C-alpha cells in the first residue's frame, strides 16, 4: 500500500498534468472556433461553385474537357493526404494514415506519388519509404489558401502532362463540434455534377475557355476546403481529447485525495492508540 508521501507526490504530478491538458483544451477551443467559422462561411461559396459547374456540365454533355473526361487506362495516381503537425488528438491522424495505406494497397500495381500535408503524414510516409513530391508542414492560417493554390497548380499541370492519371485527397470533413468524417475522394478527373437545367446557356467567349478557367479554380477550392475541414476537425478532436484527459485527471485527484485522507486518518488513529496504550502501561 503506498505511503502518504508517495500519494502526495502523485497528487502533485496529476495536478501538474491537469494544468497542461486544461491549457491545451482552452487553446484548442479558441482555434476550433476560428476554423469552424471559416469552414461554415466558405461552404456557400463551394456550393455555388459546384452548382455553376453542374449547370455548365449539363449544358455541354457532348463537349469534352481533359479534367472531366478521365483516362481509359490509369497507370499513375497522386494522393494528397492531410494530417496535423501535432498529436494529442486521439485516433485523428492514425485513421487518416490507415485510409492512406488502404488506397495504396488498392492501387499497388500503379505508380503512386503522395503529397503529404502535415508533420504526421510526412513522418509516416518517410518511415515507409513511399514516394512523395513536395511536402507541407507548419502552415499558418494566412498561408493555407496560397498552399492550396500551389498544390492544385502542380496536380493539374501534371495531370495535363499525363504524369498523373488520377488525383485523390484524404482528409477529415468537419461536421460538428463532436463529429468529423474521414473522407477519401477523387478530385481529378472531376465527376460531372448532375443538375436539371431550367434553360439553355449561351457561353461567351467559348465553353472550352470557361471550363479551362473554372475547373482549375474548382480543384483549388476543393483542396483548400479539405485543408480547412481537416484543421477544424483536428482542433475539435484535440479539444475533446484534452477535455476527457482533464476530467480523468480530476477523477484521479479526487481518488488520490480520498486515499491520502484515509491513510492520514489511519496514521492519526494509530498514533492515538499508541499514546493511550503507553499511558495505560504507566
Curated annotation (Swiss-Prot):
Keywords: ATP synthesis, Cell inner membrane, Cell membrane, CF(1), Hydrogen ion transport, Ion transport, Membrane, Transport
Biological processes, Gene Ontology terms: proton motive force-driven ATP synthesis; proton motive force-driven plasma membrane ATP synthesis
Subcellular location per the Swiss-Prot or TrEMBL entry: Cell inner membrane
MF term (GO), any: ATP binding
Principal subcellular localisation of the protein: membrane
Gene3D superfamilies (UniProt xref): 3.40.1380.10, ATP synthase, gamma subunit, helix hairpin domain (1.10.287.80)
Membrane topology field: Peripheral membrane protein
Function: Produces ATP from ADP in the presence of a proton gradient across the membrane. The gamma chain is believed to be important in regulating ATPase activity and the flow of protons through the CF(0) complex.
Subunit structure: F-type ATPases have 2 components, CF(1) - the catalytic core - and CF(0) - the membrane proton channel. CF(1) has five subunits: alpha(3), beta(3), gamma(1), delta(1), epsilon(1). CF(0) has three main subunits: a, b and c.
Protein's name in the database: ATP synthase gamma chain
Organism expressing this protein natively: Fusobacterium nucleatum subsp. nucleatum (strain ATCC 25586 / DSM 15643 / BCRC 10681 / CIP 101130 / JCM 8532 / KCTC 2640 / LMG 13131 / VPI 4355)
Upper lineage: Bacteria, Fusobacteriati, Fusobacteriota, Fusobacteriia, Fusobacteriales
Gene behind this protein: atpG
Amino acid at each position: 500500500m503506498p505511503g502518504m508521501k508517495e500519494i502526495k507526490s502523485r497528487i502533485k504530478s496529476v495536478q501538474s498534468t491537469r494544468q497542461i491538458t486544461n491549457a491545451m483544451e482552452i487553446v484548442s477551443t479558441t482555434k476550433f472556433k476560428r476554423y469552424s467559422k471559416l469552414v461554415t462561411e466558405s461552404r456557400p461559396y463551394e456550393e455555388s461553385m459546384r452548382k455553376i459547374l453542374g449547370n455548365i456540365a449539363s449544358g455541354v454533355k457532348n463537349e469534352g474537357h481533359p479534367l472531366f473526361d478521365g483516362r481509359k487506362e490509369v497507370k499513375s495516381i497522386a494522393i494528397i493526404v492531410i494530417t496535423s503537425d501535432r498529436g494529442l488528438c486521439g485516433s485523428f491522424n492514425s485513421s487518416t494514415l490507415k485510409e492512406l495505406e488502404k488506397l495504396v494497397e488498392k492501387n499497388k500495381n500503379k505508380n503512386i506519388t503522395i503529397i503529404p500535408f502535415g508533420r504526421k503524414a510526412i513522418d509516416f510516409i518517410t518511415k515507409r519509404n513511399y514516394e512523395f513530391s513536395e511536402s507541407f508542414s507548419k502552415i499558418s492560417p494566412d498561408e493555407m489558401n496560397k498552399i492550396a493554390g500551389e498544390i492544385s497548380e502542380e496536380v493539374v499541370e501534371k495531370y495535363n502532362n499525363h504524369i498523373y492519371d488520377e488525383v485523390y485527397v484524404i482528409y477529415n470533413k468537419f461536421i460538428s463540434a463532436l463529429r468529423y468524417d474521414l473522407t477519401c475522394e477523387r478530385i481529378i478527373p472531376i465527376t460531372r455534377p448532375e443538375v436539371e437545367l431550367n434553360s439553355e446557356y449561351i457561353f461567351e467567349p467559348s465553353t472550352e475557355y470557361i471550363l479551362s478557367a473554372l475547373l482549375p479554380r474548382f480543384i483549388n477550392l476543393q483542396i483548400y476546403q479539405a485543408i480547412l475541414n481537416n484543421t477544424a476537425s483536428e482542433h475539435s478532436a484535440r479539444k475533446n481529447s484534452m477535455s476527457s484527459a482533464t476530467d480523468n485527471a480530476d477523477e484521479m485527484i479526487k481518488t488520490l485525495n480520498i486515499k491520502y485522507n484515509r491513510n492520514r486518518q489511519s496514521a492519526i488513529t494509530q498514533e492515538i492508540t499508541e499514546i493511550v496504550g503507553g499511558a495505560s502501561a504507566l
